[in-house]
Amino acid sequence: MAIFNFLKLISPKNRILSKANRIASEVESYKNYYRNLTDQQLFEESNKLVDLVTKQNYTILDVCVAALALIREVVYRETGEFAYRVQIIGAFIVLSGDFAEMMTGEGKTLTIVLAAYVSALEKRGVHVVTVNEYLAQRDANNAMKILKRVGMSVGCNFANLSPQLKQAAFNCDVTYTTNSELGFDYLRDNMVHSYQDKKIRELHFAIVDEGDSVLIDEARTPLIISGPSKNEFGLYVAVDRFVKSLTEQEFKIDPESRAASLTELGIKKAEQTFKKENLFALENSDLFHKIMNGLTAVKVFEQGKEYIVRDGKVLIVDHFTGRILEGRSYSNGLQQAVQAKEYVEIEPENVIVATITYQSFFRLYNRLAAVSGTALTESEEFLKIYNMVVVPVPTNRPNIRKDRSDSVFGTPQIKWMAVVKEIKKIHETSRPILIGTANIDDSELLHNLLLEANIPHEVLNAKNHSREAEIVTKAGQKNAVTISTNMAGRGTDIRLGEGVAEMGGLYVLGTERNESRRIDNQLRGRAARQGDKGETKFFISLGDSLFKRFAHDKIERAISKLGNETFDSAFFSKMLSRTQKRVEAINFDTRKNLIDYDHVLASQRELIYKQRDKFLLANDLSEMIDKMLEKFVQQFCDQYRNQKNQNLINHIALAEALNLEMNMQNTINPKVFENMTFDVAVDKTRNLVAKKISDKVNVLTKPIALNRFRDIIITSMDKHWTEHLDSVFKLREGVVLRSMEHTSPLNVYIKETDILFKTMLQKIAQDVIVQIANLTTPDEFDHSLMQANALKKLAAIKADEKSNQE
């Protein structure tokens, strides 16, 4: 037992918490010192700390005690709030690059301001990442009032800001932004044609508010910037019609993964419908892909759960938060499949121009930290993926919330009747009640049931998210009845109205257990903030999604015994807990699988983006063009080897190709290469093309040539990178079938992606050299014009001669 206690003491989270407590004690010892300083003296003290960090090689951890004590006093003078000890502890955990788990109402927002100030002393930029623009704007406004007292600037990044205003926001010491807009700005920054047009100056330090939501829940959906492609309206409609005609014997859905596939009968039907001999043949891969998308859209996705339709548009709903994912759409044709299903306008399928996952994006930061009320259940994932230790921060006051045992019902219908009865009972006492639902459909079902029962209430879901803050703020007042999807678990405190504490505080009623215990804990966490009273309870049925998908057989047996009976069952609670852990493991594997694949693409993306920046910043491109020329010449000459003797060159074909493709204007005589060995011909070709490029520079002048060449290179890189992404996504889709050949799909993917990448680099080199060689100089333009005019005159003379003869 003594050994166990010792190991527990030295665990990373306990070690970090122990140090944070020591730091907090030291910070508290500075209280009187800073209280006795004037505002101007505090400002000067802050500047001294900046000098220590930026000029004298002190780290932020070296100065964090003085810095935290100083900003604590500044906050007090601005707001009247004196940061709690637990907020100092949380701020230190964040500064250490770890994950501070702080319960709802413990002051995460202020904790972030404290940590952001200390990190801002480095003058390299701090990004505070929030889940929506309302929170970003609210928190930025509050932070601005505090940090301007110590000379720190605060910016807020929005979706609709001009490029100039975005640059200004990111040039501030602290920038508040949403995770999606930040990710998209990063991708857009790597599509600019001038380095000065970039918005983000550096990915130095990010503090992610609601870190579990951003870094885990949203990690399964990559950020994608798309460009228009071909429109195959007719094929989408045909596939949709085909999928809707399938019988239960012609397709199947795996209940755990929710993956749909065709049975043997379905495959035969597809081949007959679309007149194909073999649906799995390479030439039919696009059709097969569209059928799989159609199956997912029609047989798996449900409106109100995965997406909603508003004003003729399909909008994705975040499964975990219930919020609409603004600006996001399904990729690789799935969006079009859903549009066909819902009979709305089918937009042209887009090609992926740039993409990144949140896992890959946030790992680009020099330092990353996060704050949330619920993270401990995913502590292994945060450590493995993001190298962050989850450290639970003690509450400022003891938590006295009552978490009652679940009530289990045989069917959803009986459960909903019981939910309404429970709401009515609580509402008659005037006690506020917050009801959490798993999706939009359930929230609207309950809304209709409460209308029938004449119980006044508010509904918060993705369809009316604009009133989120207003609805959640009032949810703690007397007589309030609030129905919400998982949205209510984030961002805005529910403060108790007068007299509510005496009633027992806020009553939180969950109507279904979520896939993750963490999401359940978020809902529970809405009650009993800062030592308030509160109570939580879940009503669940054996027909709920979690049971149906992951414990189907056990439930079938239980339903036959249970019938309509209702009881609090330790057996079902244990089964539920085991099921949730199993689902969490499955979801972790899904995200881990995503990052394993994305890691391959991430290394290529990083290389391309670094090369891109190098070209944008270079004042001399000659060395880089020489490297491209080296790649190009070998491949170019390879096409013209002598077929009978590979060591010789086909001198006539090579000379013709140079004159035609490299704009040599028939100056290359085939005799130049006659009887040359292949290697000598390669050297000769390199010299000829290099001279051609050098002549371009001399005629155009270096500044003009630099800009023209740079534009050619960047345009070519972007074009071929887009094509590469398309090839990689198609490869990834098809590579899963390799598992049937007893080979690792990931290993095949790594090998073939590497081949695709090298081919892409070769294509870029070829494209760039050919375009530069064919770049028209003023002299060449005049020569071409003279040739064209001469040809016109010749044609006119011939026409006159013909006319005279007639």
Swiss-Prot record:
Q: Does the keyword Protein transport apply?
A: yes
What's the superkingdom here? Bacteria
Q: Which UniProt keyword terms apply here?
A: ATP-binding, Cell membrane, Cytoplasm, Membrane, Nucleotide-binding, Protein transport, Translocase, Translocation, Transport
Gene Ontology cellular component annotations, sorted alphabetically: cell envelope Sec protein transport complex; cytoplasm; plasma membrane
Record-level Gene Ontology MF annotations: ATP binding; protein-exporting ATPase activity
Q: Which SMART domains match?
A: SecA_DEAD (SM00957), SecA_PP_bind (SM00958)
Location(s), subcellular = Cell membrane; Cytoplasm
A Pfam family of the record is: SecA_PP_bind
Enzyme superclass (EC): translocase
Q: How does it sit in the membrane?
A: Peripheral membrane protein
Q: What is its EC number?
A: 7.4.2.8
Q: Which Gene3D superfamilies match?
A: Helical scaffold and wing domains of SecA (1.10.3060.10), P-loop containing nucleotide triphosphate hydrolases (3.40.50.300), SecA, preprotein cross-linking domain (3.90.1440.10)
The processes (GO biological process) annotated in the record are: intracellular protein transmembrane transport; protein import; protein targeting; protein transport by the Sec complex
The reaction(s) catalysed by this protein are: ATP + H2O + cellular proteinSide 1 = ADP + phosphate + cellular proteinSide 2
Which residues of the sequence carry a binding annotation for ATP? Answer: 87, 105-109, 493
Quaternary assembly: Monomer and homodimer. Part of the essential Sec protein translocation apparatus which comprises SecA, SecYEG and auxiliary proteins SecDF. Other proteins may also be involved.
In UniProt terms, what function does this protein have? Part of the Sec protein translocase complex. Interacts with the SecYEG preprotein conducting channel. Has a central role in coupling the hydrolysis of ATP to the transfer of proteins into and across the cell membrane, serving as an ATP-driven molecular motor driving the stepwise translocation of polypeptide chains across the membrane.
Annotated family? Belongs to the SecA family.
Protein's UniProt name: Protein translocase subunit SecA
Q: Which organism is it from?
A: Mycoplasma genitalium (strain ATCC 33530 / DSM 19775 / NCTC 10195 / G37)
Name the gene behind this protein.
secA
